[in-house]
Structure formats: C-alpha cells, structure tokens
From Swiss-Prot:
Matches recorded under PANTHER family: INNER MEMBRANE PROTEIN YEIH-RELATED (PTHR30106), UPF0324 INNER MEMBRANE PROTEIN YEIH (PTHR30106:SF2)
Coiled-coil region(s): none
Topology of the protein relative to the lipid bilayer: Multi-pass membrane protein
A Pfam family it matches: Cons_hypoth698
Family: Belongs to the UPF0324 family.
Protein name: UPF0324 membrane protein AF_1621
InterPro entries for the chain: UPF0324_pro (IPR018383), UPF0324_YeiH-like (IPR004630)
Keyword Transmembrane helix: yes
This protein's record includes keyword Secreted: no
Length: 328
C-alpha cells in the first residue's frame, strides 16, 4: 500500500509540458517500432531493439535537459512495465513433459547459469554484470536481464552491454544449430530439446525449431526455463532488499500476473494483452537506455562476451552428450 501511494506521488510529480509529452511519445514510438519489427522478424527481440533505439535517440540528441526528464519518467514506467510483462511468462504444467526432459532442461539451465557466473567472477567482472549475464544466458535472454536489473541495480552501461551480448550469442546459436543438428545426426524431436534447453531468446527458439517442424515442442521446453525467472526474481529480491525479507511490490505483482495469466485467463485474453505488455516494457527499456553513453558501453570489453559464449557452449555440449548417449 505504501509503495502504491509512492508510485502515485511519483506520477503527480512528473513534469507535464508539450516538450515533455513529445519525449514520452518518442519513447513510446521506440517501443511500438520494436514490437512491429519483431512481428516481421521474431529473431529480433523487441526489448533489444527498444534498447538500441533508446541509445541511438539519446546519443543523437545529446540534450541533457531531455535526459533529466526521461530519468524522472523511468521510476513510473518501470514497475508498470514489469508488472504487465507477467502476461508474457507462461508457467507450464510439468506433468505434460517426460521427467528426463524436465531434469535435463533444469540441469542444463543451472549449468549454463553457474558456468557464466563463475567465469564472469574469475574474469573480475562486477557481481551485477555476472548475474545479468548468467540469468540472460541460462533463463530467458533479454527478458530476464530486463526484469532482474531493478533488483540488483547494475550500471546502465553494464545493463546495455549485457543485453547486446546475450542477443549476439543467441543469434550465433540460430546460425549454428542447423549445422550442429546435421553433423550430430539428431532427430527433429531431439532438436526441440537442444533448442528449447539452450537457446536464449524465445523468438530464436521459434525460428530455429520451425526448420524441423518442432516449434511447439521446443517452445514448451523453453517455457520450463522461462518459468524459472519467477524463482530467480524472488531469491534476488530477498538477497538485494534493503529491508530483511522484503520483496518489491512490482515483483509480487509480476509473479501474480504471470501465475494468473498462466492458469486462469483464457488464452485469447492473454494473446490480446501481450502486445500491450511488450510495448510498455519496450518503452521502459528505451527510456532507461536513452541516457546511456555509447562510449561507456564499449569500455565494458570482451570479457563478458567470452563468459557468455563459454557458458552457452558448456550447455550445448551437455545436452548433446545426453542425446548421444540415448538418455533423452
């Protein structure tokens, strides 16, 4: 209740003028454009596109007053965007899967997460950057990074770099997986397991698996990993809370929306709400990245890229080993 009142107070304090409304419209256009492009090419994650649009717009205009205005809108947009994005999280019923597939997916996800986090730590990346890369690699790509970032509070350049890196690794997978499937002689059903258990973004899983006619199977397996974001968010919110056992209200509402939309809302209602949720969250990312300096993003270096690729390679090797041994 207290934080709801606080959000209302933030909304009341937002600067309202013709110029500021034009800025808000620009951010909304960034989010809408990202969503529309994703409809044409699902491999291009709308949150990633919104990030790029926000960075480009901010660095082209170089108006410090506008950046200050945008920064004041972010605390209002972020909790709403995260809450609504819960409709994009489908919590699957694990009884629909073979136990060995569930186990393999959970183990490979954990293996990727731990490998990326360990390597990032060894390479002396910040704890926040390590968590962003680990969650993005192991769970659900850009979405995971965007959802957990308010909890761990990384630097803006780390946030932007993590999204770009995870997108690059995912696109690499989309290019290489057909060749891997050919040389490893795996069946379409086995490819669904490989794609669903190791690829980063949902759109890339969809495109890759369409080539083998196993789109639904691969997306269902990917859904197991996506559902893990609920547990990770809950754990991180407790670890990083300023008060003991405190979970931010927008995290609770995000989890509630995800659970409600997965179990009670009719499928057609969920499908109708997802565009709104995606555009809203994409708009929020455009606002966050509007104030990002490109030069600082470049200074992040190649170490995060190495850690992410290495963790992904370990996950792929593990799943291929299981498939080759006949365990799946």
């Amino acid at each position: 209740m207290r934080e709801t009142v606080k959000l209302i107070e933030v909304a009341r304090e937002l600067p309202v003028s013709r110029k500021n409304l034009q800025m808000l419209l620009l951010l909304l256009l960034c989010g809408a454009a990202a969503y529309i492009i994703n409809l044409a090419d699902p491999a291009l994650e709308p949150l990633f596109l919104a990030l790029v649009f926000g960075i480009v717009a901010g660095n082209l205009q170089r108006d410090e007053e506008k950046k200050r205005v945008v920064e004041r809108y972010v605390p209002f947009l972020l909790p709403i965007g995260i809450t609504l994005y819960g409709v994009n999280i489908n919590i699957p019923y694990l009884g629909e899967f073979h136990p060995e597939i569930v186990a393999a997916t959970l183990i490979s996800t954990s293996l990727i997460f731990l490998t990326v986090f360990w390597l990032s730590s060894r390479l002396k990346l910040s704890r926040q950057m390590s968590i962003l890369l680990a969650c993005g690699s192991g769970i659900c790509g850009v979405s995971a990074i965007a959802i957990i970032s308010p909890l761990i509070k990384p630097r803006k350049e780390e946030f932007s770099a993590a999204i770009m890196i995870i997108t690059a690794v995912g696109l690499t997978g989309a290019i290489l997986y057909p060749s891997i499937a050919h040389y490893a002689s795996i069946s379409p059903d086995e490819f669904a397991v490989l794609a669903g258990a190791t690829l980063h973004q949902t759109g890339i899983v969809k495109i890759s698996s369409q080539l083998f006619g196993v789109e639904e199977e691969a997306l269902a397996i990917k859904g197991i990993r996506i559902a893990m974001i609920a547990l990770v968010v809950l754990i991180l919110s407790i670890i990083y809370s300023e008060s003991r056992f405190y979970v931010p209200w927008y995290i609770v509402s995000f989890l509630g929306v995800a659970l409600f939309s997965s179990t009670y809302l009719p499928g057609e209602v969920v499908q109708a709400l997802r565009p709104l949720a995606t555009v809203m969250f994409a708009t929020t990312l455009a606002a966050i990245c509007y104030t990002v300096n490109v030069g600082r993003v470049q200074r992040v270096g190649v170490k995060p890229l190495f850690a992410s690729y290495a963790g992904w390679a370990v996950g792929v090797a593990f799943v291929l080993l299981l498939l080759g041994s006949g365990a799946l």
